[in-house]
């Protein structure tokens, strides 16, 4: 029983340490990656190409990805630069 509790504790600890992020992929210029006129699997393929687990086209407008590595830039409302001049 003690080993089982130890195993579960380690499992949750690893889950907290290896935390990935979810969010919208960004295009050049800081805008969300559009999927309006793309094929149905476009977002899943793009997310996988960026080493994410999966993705989908949110409301047929932008690619949303799950479990993205920390090095991938994702769109953030607070730092949004889409359509703004430098």
Curated annotation (Swiss-Prot):
This is Beta-toxin To4. The lineage of its organism: Eukaryota, Metazoa, Ecdysozoa, Arthropoda, Chelicerata. GO terms for cellular component: extracellular region. Beta toxins bind voltage-independently at site-4 of sodium channels (Nav) and shift the voltage of activation toward more negative potentials thereby affecting sodium channel activation and promoting spontaneous and repetitive firing. This toxin shows moderate inhibition of Nav1.1/SCN1A, Nav1.2/SCN2A, and Nav1.4/SCN4A, and promotes a left voltage shift on these channels. It exhibits similar potency on Nav1.2/SCN2A and Nav1.4/SCN4A (40-50% peak current inhibition at 0.5 uM), and weaker inhibition on Nav1.2 (20-30% peak current inhibition at 0.5 uM). Residues 1-20 form the signal peptide. Expressed by the venom gland. PROSITE patterns: LCN_CSAB. Shows weak inhibition on Nav1.3/SCN3A, Nav1.5/SCN5A, Nav1.8/SCN8A, and Nav1.7/SCN9A. GO terms for molecular function: sodium channel inhibitor activity; toxin activity. Residues 21-83 form the LCN-type CS-alpha/beta domain. One of its GO terms (biological process) is defense response. The modification Cysteine amide is found at residue 82. InterPro entries: LCN-type_CS_alpha_beta_dom, Scorpion_toxin-like, Scorpion_toxin-like_sf, Scorpion_toxinL, Scorpion_toxinL/defensin. Has the structural arrangement of an alpha-helix connected to antiparallel beta-sheets by disulfide bonds (CS-alpha/beta). Keywords: Amidation, Disulfide bond, Ion channel impairing toxin, Neurotoxin, Secreted, Signal, Toxin, Voltage-gated sodium channel impairing toxin. Its main location: secreted. Belongs to the long (4 C-C) scorpion toxin superfamily. Sodium channel inhibitor family. Beta subfamily. It is found in: Secreted. CDD domains: neurotoxins_LC_scorpion (cd23106). Disulfide bonds join 31-82, 35-57, 43-63, 47-65.
């Amino acid at each position: 029983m003690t080993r089982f509790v130890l195993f579960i504790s380690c499992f949750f600890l690893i889950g907290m340490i290896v935390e990935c992020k979810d969010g919208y992929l960004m295009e050049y210029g800081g805008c969300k990656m559009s999927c309006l006129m793309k094929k149905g699997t476009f977002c899943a393929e793009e997310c996988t190409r960026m080493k994410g687990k999966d993705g989908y086209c949110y409301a047929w407008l932008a690619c949303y990805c799950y479990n993205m590595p920390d090095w991938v830039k994702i769109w953030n409302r607070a730092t949004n630069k889409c359509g703004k001049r430098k």
